[in-house]
A protein has these predicted regions:
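Structured binding/interaction patches within domain cores
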Residues: 37-191
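Leu/Val/Ala/Ile-rich N-terminal alpha-helices, chiefly Sec-type signal peptides and the beginnings
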Residues: 2, 7-59
Length: 191
């Protein structure tokens, strides 16, 4: 009888794994939590966050890697549209610069706007510091920040009266206004 690994028993390790019982990186753990096929590139997770965590996971020592465990559930469902992913990529480059990493120039700079490059670059900037305990904590907080970015709210096509308040409250207010503006006889004539 073989023992199967679940998200509750898997230990985080470096690299890509063919199956959970052989270990899992933080992204593979996230795929398990998202109930997706076992992969280090789950569809429901932001590509920028995924790139950051794949690189960071593989560069950490085994002890600090386990600190990534809570992030796996946090990042499920973070995949978003272009605007949010561009903002995440931009923040990754800012995070890198804040850690002292110079951004590439010339043609290489153009590629930094992609999810894979910007996320990996930010993780590498953190890993270059050792990472120190302070930078490790900053990296964990940075992932939380990236995960909290939501798509901008678009203009709704519904009338404000419909989405602005509880419909029951709107009906009560309309009836109260009707009662003030019409007499009892007029109301009976309407019924």
């Amino acid at each position: 009888m073989t023992m199967s690994s679940t998200y509750q028993t898997v230990r985080l390790s470096a690299g890509r794994h063919p199956a959970p019982h052989l270990g899992a990186c933080v992204m593979e753990l996230a795929s398990m939590l998202a109930e997706e096929p076992f992969t280090d590139r789950p569809a429901t997770i932001s590509p920028v966050i995924g790139a950051f965590l794949r690189t960071y996971n593989d560069g950490l020592d085994d002890g600090r890697r386990q600190d990534l465990y809570p992030l796996a559930s946090l990042i499920v469902g973070t995949a978003a549209g272009r605007a949010v992913e561009r903002e995440r990529a931009s923040r990754c480059l800012g995070f890198s610069r804040a850690l002292g990493a110079a951004l590439p120039s010339g043609r290489a700079a153009v590629g930094m706007g992609t999810p894979e490059a910007s996320g990996s670059w930010a993780a590498l900037a953190a890993l270059r510091t050792g990472p120190s305990q302070e930078v490790h904590e900053r990296a964990l907080q940075f992932v939380r920040e990236l995960a909290s970015l939501n798509p901008p709210h678009r203009n709704r096509r519904w009338p404000a009266w419909l989405v602005g308040r509880d419909p029951g409250e709107a009906v009560e207010q309309a009836l109260a206004e009707l009662g003030r503006s019409s007499s009892v006889e007029e109301r009976h004539a309407l019924v």
